[in-house]
Amino acid sequence: MTYDKRLIVFDWDGTLMDSIGRIVSSMQNTAQHVGLPVPTDVAVRDIIGLSLEPAIEKLFGLLNPVELDGFLVQYRDEYVDLNPTPSPLFNDAKAVLSQLTDSGFELAVATGKARRGLKRVWSESETEHYFATSRCASETRGKPDPQMLYEIMDELNAHPEETVMVGDSVHDMKMAIAAGVHPVGVSFGVHDAERLREAGAALVVDSLTELSDRLIKERP
């Protein structure tokens, strides 16, 4: 039996929203505030896509509970309220989401953000209505574990062969492969095309418009 692609699952940060600079500077500002070594831009970019606590451990080692709680509170304040770095949607994001839904695709989000963070950016960007469902790292196992994708496919009655995972990081590609879905990378986020292909991306696109054009063209 063959399956047509009908479900497209998007990562959020660096895929639909140009938020990488804000994440990097927020992590660095938080480290400085709590007295930890300030990580490089490259080091922070490499953990984007992971849920927050594993990302912190990868950057700073295992913190004790008091240190971790203090870091989490400061980081969330920094990212949401204190950091002036803009984090807009990519210019073609809304048009692409509209084109894909109009063409009959179901859309979903699988993100390392907490639910509170996703709801906030959905409200700010007025995009929640495009998505049939979503999973956040705060409510299931985080990337690159495939559990997010399993839960999304189960809820929407989609087979892996019908599903595309779109993301900007190697964590997205590894999750997609583990779940048996089609891994598609975008080259304008945290990891470049070469790293995405090395991680298993079957296709790497240079814009969301290119992604939409390819998917709609290949739809029966």
Kindly give the residue locations of the regions a language model identified:
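Active-site neighborhood of HAD-like aspartate-dependent phosphohydrolases
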Residues: 1-46, 62
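A metal-dependent, Asp-based hydrolase signature
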Residues: 48-81, 94, 98-101
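Substrate-recognition "cap/lid" segment bordering the active-site pocket of phosphatases
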Residues: 85-88, 114-165, 170-179, 193-197
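Hydrophobic alpha-helical segments typical of transmembrane helices
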Residues: 26, 40-43, 51, 55, ...
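Short acidic-hydrophobic, aromatic-tinged amphipathic segments that line or gate anion-handling sites
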Residues: 203-207
